[in-house]
């Protein structure tokens, strides 16, 4: 029963690193989340969001073409999928990035790589209660 509810959650994973993308998708699958769409940069994510609305966005900051901050700016300026929670997952240890991330409306968490999947699972569990 728990997995049925969990599987309803649509997750957009925005991550350019193929290995990290694969590992994160696999870990989310192991946690019962199977409705995951993965894209490699912010531009692909914006294109995806024009026709789709996920329940959660997991976002890397450092990507080619359109990075995470540019993605969030474009998303807000174009009022695309407002209210969809964003979990930032980044290798950037810069305090300025963490502070800048707090200025965006939908950012609910900032996690540093290597990703602590227990923390991500707790975030997903708390969100799942809101998504029912």
Model-found features: residue ranges?
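Hydrophobic/aromatic residues positioned on beta-strands within the core alpha/beta folds
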Residues: 89-90
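Receiver (REC) domain active-site loop signature in two-component systems and cognate sites
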Residues: 63
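Active-site residues of response regulator receiver
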Residues: 60
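Non-catalytic signal-transmission and effector/linker regions of two-component phosphorelay proteins
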Residues: 1-10, 116-132
